[in-house]
C-alpha cells in the first residue's frame, strides 16, 4: 500500500489523520462494511479508439488526489491495487473478478480508471454478485459510448454490448453533448431506449428524471467519465469537452443519486495526468469520491446495506 498511498503526516491523533494513513490492503478486510478501491489502469480501449496515451496512469493520480484529504470517521477503507492484465478484454475480466470479490467481502467498490471500458468489467462483476437484480446504469459523460463492437471492443463500446447481452439493464446518461455524438449514435441510443439528459437541461429536471429512473431499478451503478466536465475544470482527459458540465452541478446530481440508497458501485474514468493542469482533474475526481464516501456513511449504514440489497 505504501507504493500507492503516501503523503505528509500532521500527527497520529485520530482527528488529524489523512486518508492515506487509514487505507488498508483488502487482505486485511475481516468484516463487512467499508469501501474498497480498485484500479483499472489500462488505456488499451482508448488507444483502440485513437485516443491519447496516459490514462493508464489515472488510477494512481486519483489516489494521489485523495491522499491528503481528511480521513472519514466510521469508514473503513481498503484497496485492491491495480490490474495485472492490460489488454482490454483480459483487463475487463480481471476487473470483474475483483469487483465480485469485493462484494463477497461485503464492501462497496470504487473503481479508478483508466479507460471508460471499465464499464463492461464493472457490469460483469456486479452481475456476478447480483444475478437476478434489475440494474440501472447512470453515466456522467459527454459521449454515449454506444458504438458498435463488431470489429473489436474500445473505450466507447461498453454500453452497446451490455444492452445487447442483458435485457435486465437500463442505461441513463447525464451531461450528454449533442455536438460530441453522431446522429447514428443518437439513433442507436433511441433504439435502446436510453434516457438521454443533455448537459444544458435544467438541473431540477435532470435530478427528477434520474430519480424516476432509479425508482424502476433494484440496484444502480454510477460511472463518471471525467470528460463530462468542462475542460477548464477537467483538462486531464483523453477527449476534453467544450462547454461541459459545471463541477458543482455534477456534485449536486451525484448527491441526489446517492441519496436514493440504491447505488452499489461507482467508478471514475478517463483521467489522463499527462494532460492535466495542476492536478485539477485528479483532484476533482478525488473530491467526487470523497463526496461519495461521506454519503455512504450518512445514508447506507454500512453494517446493513449489503445484506439488505442481497
Question: Predicted segment positions?
Answer:
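Conserved alpha-helical scaffold segments that buttress catalytic/binding sites
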Residues: 2-310
Amino acid at each position: 500500500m505504501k507504493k500507492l498511498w503516501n503523503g505528509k503526516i500532521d500527527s497520529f491523533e485520530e482527528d488529524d489523520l489523512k486518508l492515506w494513513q487509514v487505507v488498508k490492503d483488502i487482505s486485511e478486510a475481516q468484516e463487512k462494511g467499508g469501501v474498497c478501491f480498485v484500479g483499472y489502469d489500462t488505456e488499451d480501449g482508448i488507444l483502440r479508439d485513437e485516443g491519447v496515451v496516459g490514462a493508464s496512469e489515472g488510477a494512481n493520480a486519483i489516489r494521489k488526489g485523495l491522499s491528503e484529504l481528511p480521513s472519514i470517521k466510521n469508514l473503513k477503507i481498503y484497496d485492491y491495487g491495480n490490474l495485472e492484465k492490460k489488454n482490454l478484454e483480459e483487463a475487463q475480466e480481471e476487473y470483474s473478478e475483483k469487483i465480485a470479490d469485493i462484494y463477497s467481502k461485503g464492501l462497496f467498490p470504487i473503481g479508478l480508471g483508466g479507460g471508460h471500458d471499465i464499464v463492461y468489467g464493472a457490469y460483469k462483476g456486479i452481475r456476478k454478485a447480483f444475478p437476478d437484480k434489475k440494474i440501472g446504469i447512470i453515466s456522467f459523460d459527454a459521449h454515449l459510448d454506444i458504438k458498435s463492437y463488431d470489429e473489436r471492443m474500445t473505450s466507447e463500446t461498453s454500453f452497446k454490448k451490455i444492452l445487447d447481452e442483458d435485457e435486465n439493464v437500463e442505461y441513463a446518461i447525464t451531461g450528454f453533448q449533442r455536438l460530441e455524438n453522431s446522429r447514428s449514435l443518437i439513433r442507436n441510443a433511441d433504439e435502446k431506449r436510453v434516457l438521454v439528459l443533455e448537459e444544458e437541461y435544467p438541473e431540477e429536471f435532470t435530478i427528477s428524471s434520474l430519480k424516476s429512473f432509479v425508482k424502476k431499478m433494484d440496484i444502480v451503478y454510477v460511472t463518471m467519465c471525467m470528460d463530462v466536465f468542462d475542460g477548464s475544470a477537467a483538462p486531464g482527459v483523453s477527449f476534453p469537452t467544450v462547454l461541459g458540465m459545471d463541477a458543482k452541478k455534477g456534485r449536486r446530481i451525484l448527491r441526489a443519486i446517492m441519496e436514493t440508497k440504491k447505488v452499489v458501485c461507482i467508478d471514475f474514468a478517463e483521467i489522463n495526468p499527462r494532460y492535466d493542469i495542476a492536478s485539477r482533474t485528479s483532484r476533482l475526481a478525488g473530491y467526487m469520491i470523497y463526496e461519495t464516501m461521506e454519503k455512504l456513511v450518512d445514508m447506507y449504514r454500512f453494517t446493513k446495506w449489503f445484506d439488505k440489497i442481497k
